[in-house]
Amino acid sequence: MFYDDDADLSIIQGRKVGVIGYGSQGHAHSLSLRDSGVQVRVGLKQGSRSRPKVEEQGLDVDTPAEVAKWADVVMVLAPDTAQAEIFAGDIEPNLKPGDALFFGHGLNVHFGLIKPPADVAVAMVAPKGPGHLVRRQFVDGKGVPCLVAVEQDPRGDGLALALSYAKAIGGTRAGVIKTTFKDETETDLFGEQTVLCGGTEELVKAGFEVMVEAGYPAELAYFEVLHELKLIVDLMYEGGLARMYYSVSDTAEFGGYLSGPRVIDAGTKERMRDILREIQDGSFVHKLVADVEGGNKQLEELRRQNAEHPIEVVGKKLRDLMSWVDRPITETA
Protein backbone atom coordinates (compact mmCIF):
# COMPACT_ATOMS: atom_id res chain seq x y z
CA MET A 1 0.00 0.00 0.00
CA PHE A 2 1.28 3.47 -0.89
CA TYR A 3 0.43 6.72 0.91
CA ASP A 4 1.27 10.42 0.62
CA ASP A 5 4.85 9.97 1.84
CA ASP A 6 5.47 7.39 -0.89
CA ALA A 7 4.60 9.74 -3.75
CA ASP A 8 6.35 12.85 -5.07
CA LEU A 9 3.81 15.38 -6.31
CA SER A 10 6.47 17.42 -8.09
CA ILE A 11 6.88 14.65 -10.70
CA ILE A 12 3.42 15.14 -12.18
CA GLN A 13 3.65 18.89 -11.59
CA GLY A 14 6.58 18.87 -13.99
CA ARG A 15 4.55 17.19 -16.74
CA LYS A 16 1.72 18.30 -19.03
CA VAL A 17 -1.37 16.13 -18.61
CA GLY A 18 -4.02 15.69 -21.26
CA VAL A 19 -7.26 14.11 -20.04
CA ILE A 20 -9.29 12.52 -22.82
CA GLY A 21 -12.96 12.54 -21.85
CA TYR A 22 -14.95 14.56 -19.33
CA GLY A 23 -17.42 12.11 -17.85
CA SER A 24 -17.62 10.90 -14.27
CA GLN A 25 -13.88 10.29 -13.84
CA GLY A 26 -12.68 12.82 -16.41
CA HIS A 27 -14.05 15.85 -14.62
CA ALA A 28 -12.79 14.64 -11.22
CA HIS A 29 -9.27 13.97 -12.50
CA SER A 30 -9.03 17.22 -14.47
CA LEU A 31 -10.21 19.53 -11.70
CA SER A 32 -8.15 17.84 -8.99
CA LEU A 33 -5.01 17.80 -11.15
CA ARG A 34 -5.46 21.52 -11.76
CA ASP A 35 -5.97 22.18 -8.06
CA SER A 36 -2.78 20.22 -7.34
CA GLY A 37 -0.75 22.57 -9.52
CA VAL A 38 -0.59 20.38 -12.62
CA GLN A 39 -0.82 21.72 -16.17
CA VAL A 40 -3.91 20.04 -17.61
CA ARG A 41 -5.99 20.20 -20.77
CA VAL A 42 -9.14 18.28 -21.63
CA GLY A 43 -9.54 16.51 -24.97
CA LEU A 44 -13.05 16.44 -26.44
CA LYS A 45 -14.26 16.17 -30.00
CA GLN A 46 -15.69 19.23 -31.70
CA GLY A 47 -19.35 19.60 -30.85
CA SER A 48 -19.15 17.65 -27.60
CA ARG A 49 -21.89 18.70 -25.19
CA SER A 50 -19.32 18.68 -22.38
CA ARG A 51 -17.20 21.46 -23.91
CA PRO A 52 -19.17 24.38 -22.39
CA LYS A 53 -19.01 22.72 -18.96
CA VAL A 54 -15.23 22.33 -19.21
CA GLU A 55 -14.83 25.98 -20.13
CA GLU A 56 -17.20 27.12 -17.37
CA GLN A 57 -15.03 25.27 -14.85
CA GLY A 58 -11.96 27.14 -16.03
CA LEU A 59 -10.16 24.36 -17.87
CA ASP A 60 -8.56 24.47 -21.29
CA VAL A 61 -10.24 22.22 -23.87
CA ASP A 62 -9.20 21.16 -27.36
CA THR A 63 -9.61 18.18 -29.66
CA PRO A 64 -8.15 14.87 -28.49
CA ALA A 65 -5.50 15.08 -31.22
CA GLU A 66 -4.34 18.56 -30.21
CA VAL A 67 -4.34 17.66 -26.54
CA ALA A 68 -2.29 14.52 -27.22
CA LYS A 69 0.16 16.59 -29.24
CA TRP A 70 0.55 19.12 -26.40
CA ALA A 71 0.71 16.67 -23.48
CA ASP A 72 3.46 14.34 -22.35
CA VAL A 73 1.07 12.36 -20.12
CA VAL A 74 -2.20 11.34 -21.76
CA MET A 75 -4.91 9.93 -19.48
CA VAL A 76 -7.58 8.09 -21.46
CA LEU A 77 -10.93 8.31 -19.68
CA ALA A 78 -13.27 8.04 -22.65
CA PRO A 79 -15.78 5.15 -22.65
CA ASP A 80 -14.18 1.72 -23.11
CA THR A 81 -15.91 1.15 -26.44
CA ALA A 82 -14.62 4.45 -27.88
CA GLN A 83 -11.01 4.25 -26.71
CA ALA A 84 -9.49 2.16 -29.50
CA GLU A 85 -10.80 4.50 -32.21
CA ILE A 86 -9.67 7.61 -30.33
CA PHE A 87 -6.26 6.09 -29.74
CA ALA A 88 -5.73 5.10 -33.37
CA GLY A 89 -6.99 8.35 -34.86
CA ASP A 90 -5.99 11.02 -32.35
CA ILE A 91 -3.54 9.82 -29.72
CA GLU A 92 -1.09 7.39 -31.31
CA PRO A 93 -0.05 9.71 -34.19
CA ASN A 94 0.86 12.37 -31.62
CA LEU A 95 2.74 10.29 -29.06
CA LYS A 96 6.44 11.06 -28.64
CA PRO A 97 9.21 8.90 -27.16
CA GLY A 98 9.21 9.42 -23.40
CA ASP A 99 5.50 10.21 -23.21
CA ALA A 100 3.24 8.33 -20.82
CA LEU A 101 -0.11 6.81 -21.67
CA PHE A 102 -2.43 6.39 -18.68
CA PHE A 103 -5.77 4.61 -18.34
CA GLY A 104 -8.51 4.46 -15.72
CA HIS A 105 -9.35 0.86 -16.67
CA GLY A 106 -7.21 -1.81 -18.29
CA LEU A 107 -9.62 -3.44 -20.74
CA ASN A 108 -8.36 -2.04 -24.04
CA VAL A 109 -4.68 -2.58 -23.28
CA HIS A 110 -5.05 -5.99 -21.64
CA PHE A 111 -7.06 -7.44 -24.51
CA GLY A 112 -4.89 -5.88 -27.20
CA LEU A 113 -7.46 -3.44 -28.59
CA ILE A 114 -4.89 -0.71 -27.96
CA LYS A 115 -1.23 -1.49 -28.62
CA PRO A 116 0.93 1.42 -27.45
CA PRO A 117 4.36 2.02 -29.03
CA ALA A 118 7.28 0.54 -27.10
CA ASP A 119 8.89 3.90 -26.29
CA VAL A 120 6.05 5.25 -24.11
CA ALA A 121 5.19 4.32 -20.53
CA VAL A 122 1.81 2.66 -20.05
CA ALA A 123 0.19 2.82 -16.62
CA MET A 124 -3.16 2.83 -14.89
CA VAL A 125 -4.54 4.98 -12.09
CA ALA A 126 -8.02 3.78 -11.15
CA PRO A 127 -9.91 5.30 -8.21
CA LYS A 128 -12.25 2.76 -6.61
CA GLY A 129 -15.20 5.08 -6.55
CA PRO A 130 -17.33 7.20 -8.89
CA GLY A 131 -16.00 10.52 -10.10
CA HIS A 132 -18.27 12.71 -7.99
CA LEU A 133 -16.99 10.94 -4.85
CA VAL A 134 -13.36 11.24 -5.98
CA ARG A 135 -13.81 14.97 -6.46
CA ARG A 136 -15.77 15.55 -3.25
CA GLN A 137 -13.23 13.68 -1.16
CA PHE A 138 -10.39 15.63 -2.76
CA VAL A 139 -12.06 18.97 -2.04
CA ASP A 140 -12.64 17.87 1.57
CA GLY A 141 -8.94 17.10 1.99
CA LYS A 142 -9.49 13.36 1.86
CA GLY A 143 -9.26 10.77 -0.89
CA VAL A 144 -10.62 7.61 -2.49
CA PRO A 145 -8.38 4.51 -2.61
CA CYS A 146 -6.81 3.90 -6.02
CA LEU A 147 -5.31 1.05 -7.95
CA VAL A 148 -2.10 1.63 -9.89
CA ALA A 149 -0.46 -0.64 -12.44
CA VAL A 150 2.45 -0.29 -14.83
CA GLU A 151 2.19 -2.29 -18.04
CA GLN A 152 5.13 -0.81 -19.95
CA ASP A 153 8.05 1.12 -18.47
CA PRO A 154 10.83 1.96 -20.95
CA ARG A 155 12.49 4.56 -18.68
CA GLY A 156 11.90 2.86 -15.33
CA ASP A 157 9.93 5.75 -13.85
CA GLY A 158 6.40 4.53 -14.55
CA LEU A 159 5.45 3.66 -10.98
CA ALA A 160 6.77 6.93 -9.57
CA LEU A 161 4.82 8.85 -12.21
CA ALA A 162 1.63 6.87 -11.55
CA LEU A 163 1.91 7.41 -7.79
CA SER A 164 2.49 11.11 -8.34
CA TYR A 165 -0.63 11.28 -10.50
CA ALA A 166 -2.60 9.35 -7.87
CA LYS A 167 -1.44 11.82 -5.23
CA ALA A 168 -2.61 14.73 -7.38
CA ILE A 169 -6.18 13.39 -7.39
CA GLY A 170 -6.17 12.50 -3.67
CA GLY A 171 -5.59 8.76 -3.94
CA THR A 172 -2.55 8.53 -1.68
CA ARG A 173 -4.46 10.24 1.13
CA ALA A 174 -6.56 7.08 1.40
CA GLY A 175 -4.11 4.49 0.06
CA VAL A 176 -2.97 3.15 -3.30
CA ILE A 177 -2.78 -0.56 -4.14
CA LYS A 178 -0.39 -1.85 -6.79
CA THR A 179 -1.92 -4.34 -9.22
CA THR A 180 -1.67 -5.37 -12.87
CA PHE A 181 -3.72 -4.51 -15.95
CA LYS A 182 -4.73 -8.18 -16.15
CA ASP A 183 -5.99 -8.48 -12.58
CA GLU A 184 -7.80 -5.13 -12.57
CA THR A 185 -9.54 -5.81 -15.86
CA GLU A 186 -10.61 -9.38 -15.24
CA THR A 187 -11.80 -8.83 -11.67
CA ASP A 188 -13.67 -5.67 -12.64
CA LEU A 189 -15.52 -7.39 -15.48
CA PHE A 190 -16.27 -10.45 -13.35
CA GLY A 191 -17.69 -8.39 -10.50
CA GLU A 192 -19.88 -6.37 -12.85
CA GLN A 193 -21.26 -9.35 -14.71
CA THR A 194 -21.85 -11.89 -11.96
CA VAL A 195 -22.66 -9.81 -8.89
CA LEU A 196 -22.93 -6.05 -9.16
CA CYS A 197 -24.93 -5.67 -12.37
CA GLY A 198 -25.88 -8.93 -14.03
CA GLY A 199 -26.28 -11.16 -10.98
CA THR A 200 -28.06 -8.64 -8.79
CA GLU A 201 -30.44 -7.57 -11.55
CA GLU A 202 -31.49 -11.11 -12.38
CA LEU A 203 -31.90 -12.01 -8.69
CA VAL A 204 -34.15 -8.99 -8.16
CA LYS A 205 -36.25 -9.70 -11.25
CA ALA A 206 -36.63 -13.38 -10.36
CA GLY A 207 -37.75 -12.57 -6.82
CA PHE A 208 -40.23 -10.01 -8.13
CA GLU A 209 -41.64 -12.45 -10.69
CA VAL A 210 -42.06 -15.28 -8.16
CA MET A 211 -44.05 -13.07 -5.79
CA VAL A 212 -46.25 -11.53 -8.48
CA GLU A 213 -46.92 -14.94 -10.06
CA ALA A 214 -47.94 -16.19 -6.59
CA GLY A 215 -50.59 -13.46 -6.42
CA TYR A 216 -48.89 -10.82 -4.29
CA PRO A 217 -49.29 -7.14 -5.28
CA ALA A 218 -46.51 -5.87 -7.56
CA GLU A 219 -46.01 -2.89 -5.26
CA LEU A 220 -45.19 -5.13 -2.28
CA ALA A 221 -42.90 -7.25 -4.41
CA TYR A 222 -41.02 -4.15 -5.57
CA PHE A 223 -40.47 -2.93 -2.02
CA GLU A 224 -39.27 -6.31 -0.77
CA VAL A 225 -36.77 -7.18 -3.51
CA LEU A 226 -35.60 -3.86 -4.95
CA HIS A 227 -36.35 -0.86 -2.75
CA GLU A 228 -35.04 -2.46 0.45
CA LEU A 229 -31.93 -3.77 -1.30
CA LYS A 230 -30.22 -0.42 -0.73
CA LEU A 231 -30.69 -0.74 3.04
CA ILE A 232 -28.94 -4.11 3.05
CA VAL A 233 -26.15 -3.10 0.67
CA ASP A 234 -25.45 0.04 2.71
CA LEU A 235 -24.97 -2.10 5.82
CA MET A 236 -22.58 -4.41 3.97
CA TYR A 237 -20.74 -1.38 2.57
CA GLU A 238 -20.28 0.08 6.05
CA GLY A 239 -19.23 -3.03 7.94
CA GLY A 240 -19.24 -6.16 5.84
CA LEU A 241 -21.55 -9.16 6.03
CA ALA A 242 -21.33 -9.31 9.82
CA ARG A 243 -22.60 -5.73 10.17
CA MET A 244 -25.55 -6.52 7.93
CA TYR A 245 -26.60 -9.57 9.93
CA TYR A 246 -26.02 -7.74 13.23
CA SER A 247 -28.40 -5.00 12.09
CA VAL A 248 -31.31 -7.08 10.77
CA SER A 249 -33.77 -9.11 12.83
CA ASP A 250 -33.00 -12.61 14.08
CA THR A 251 -35.77 -13.84 11.80
CA ALA A 252 -34.13 -12.28 8.75
CA GLU A 253 -30.72 -13.60 9.78
CA PHE A 254 -31.94 -17.16 10.38
CA GLY A 255 -33.92 -17.21 7.15
CA GLY A 256 -31.00 -15.81 5.22
CA TYR A 257 -28.64 -18.50 6.45
CA LEU A 258 -31.11 -21.27 5.58
CA SER A 259 -32.41 -20.04 2.23
CA GLY A 260 -29.50 -18.14 0.72
CA PRO A 261 -27.48 -21.27 -0.17
CA ARG A 262 -30.58 -22.76 -1.83
CA VAL A 263 -30.77 -19.78 -4.19
CA ILE A 264 -27.04 -19.38 -4.83
CA ASP A 265 -25.76 -22.95 -4.89
CA ALA A 266 -22.84 -24.95 -6.27
CA GLY A 267 -24.34 -24.79 -9.75
CA THR A 268 -24.40 -21.00 -9.59
CA LYS A 269 -20.76 -20.97 -8.56
CA GLU A 270 -19.81 -23.24 -11.46
CA ARG A 271 -21.59 -20.97 -13.93
CA MET A 272 -19.72 -18.04 -12.42
CA ARG A 273 -16.49 -19.92 -13.15
CA ASP A 274 -17.65 -20.32 -16.76
CA ILE A 275 -18.20 -16.57 -17.00
CA LEU A 276 -14.76 -15.91 -15.53
CA ARG A 277 -13.19 -18.18 -18.14
CA GLU A 278 -15.02 -16.31 -20.91
CA ILE A 279 -13.61 -13.06 -19.55
CA GLN A 280 -10.09 -14.45 -19.24
CA ASP A 281 -9.94 -15.96 -22.72
CA GLY A 282 -11.31 -12.84 -24.41
CA SER A 283 -14.66 -14.32 -25.46
CA PHE A 284 -16.64 -11.59 -23.74
CA VAL A 285 -14.59 -8.77 -25.22
CA HIS A 286 -14.91 -10.36 -28.66
CA LYS A 287 -18.72 -10.21 -28.27
CA LEU A 288 -18.52 -6.62 -27.02
CA VAL A 289 -16.38 -5.46 -29.94
CA ALA A 290 -18.56 -7.30 -32.47
CA ASP A 291 -21.68 -5.60 -31.12
CA VAL A 292 -20.04 -2.16 -31.17
CA GLU A 293 -18.91 -2.69 -34.76
CA GLY A 294 -22.43 -3.80 -35.65
CA GLY A 295 -23.99 -0.62 -34.29
CA ASN A 296 -24.77 -1.85 -30.75
CA LYS A 297 -27.84 -3.74 -31.99
CA GLN A 298 -27.71 -6.43 -29.32
CA LEU A 299 -27.11 -3.89 -26.56
CA GLU A 300 -30.03 -1.75 -27.69
CA GLU A 301 -32.36 -4.76 -27.86
CA LEU A 302 -31.34 -5.88 -24.36
CA ARG A 303 -31.91 -2.35 -23.07
CA ARG A 304 -35.37 -2.33 -24.63
CA GLN A 305 -36.30 -5.66 -23.06
CA ASN A 306 -35.07 -4.55 -19.66
CA ALA A 307 -36.98 -1.26 -19.78
CA GLU A 308 -40.22 -3.14 -20.48
CA HIS A 309 -39.96 -5.47 -17.47
CA PRO A 310 -42.94 -5.01 -15.09
CA ILE A 311 -40.64 -4.12 -12.19
CA GLU A 312 -39.58 -1.01 -14.09
CA VAL A 313 -43.19 0.04 -14.66
CA VAL A 314 -44.27 -0.32 -11.04
CA GLY A 315 -40.97 1.08 -9.81
CA LYS A 316 -41.41 4.35 -11.66
CA LYS A 317 -44.88 4.81 -10.15
CA LEU A 318 -43.66 4.10 -6.62
CA ARG A 319 -40.65 6.38 -6.91
CA ASP A 320 -43.05 9.22 -7.74
CA LEU A 321 -44.18 8.91 -4.11
CA MET A 322 -40.65 9.14 -2.68
CA SER A 323 -39.67 12.79 -2.32
CA TRP A 324 -36.35 11.79 -0.77
CA VAL A 325 -35.18 9.82 -3.80
CA ASP A 326 -33.10 11.69 -6.39
CA ARG A 327 -34.80 11.13 -9.72
CA PRO A 328 -32.82 10.54 -12.91
CA ILE A 329 -33.39 12.91 -15.82
CA THR A 330 -35.07 10.12 -17.81
CA GLU A 331 -37.83 9.89 -15.18
CA THR A 332 -38.36 13.61 -14.61
CA ALA A 333 -38.42 14.76 -18.24
From Swiss-Prot:
Catalytic activity: (2R)-2,3-dihydroxy-3-methylbutanoate + NADP(+) = (2S)-2-acetolactate + NADPH + H(+); (2R,3R)-2,3-dihydroxy-3-methylpentanoate + NADP(+) = (S)-2-ethyl-2-hydroxy-3-oxobutanoate + NADPH + H(+)
Domain KARI N-terminal Rossmann: from-to ranges: 1-179
Keyword annotations of the record: Amino-acid biosynthesis, Branched-chain amino acid biosynthesis, Magnesium, Metal-binding, NADP, Oxidoreductase
The protein's required cofactors: Mg(2+)
Residue intervals of the KARI C-terminal knotted domain: 180-325
GO cellular component, one term: cytosol
Cofactor binding annotation: Binds 2 magnesium ions per subunit.
Protein name (database record): Ketol-acid reductoisomerase (NADP(+))
Gene: ilvC
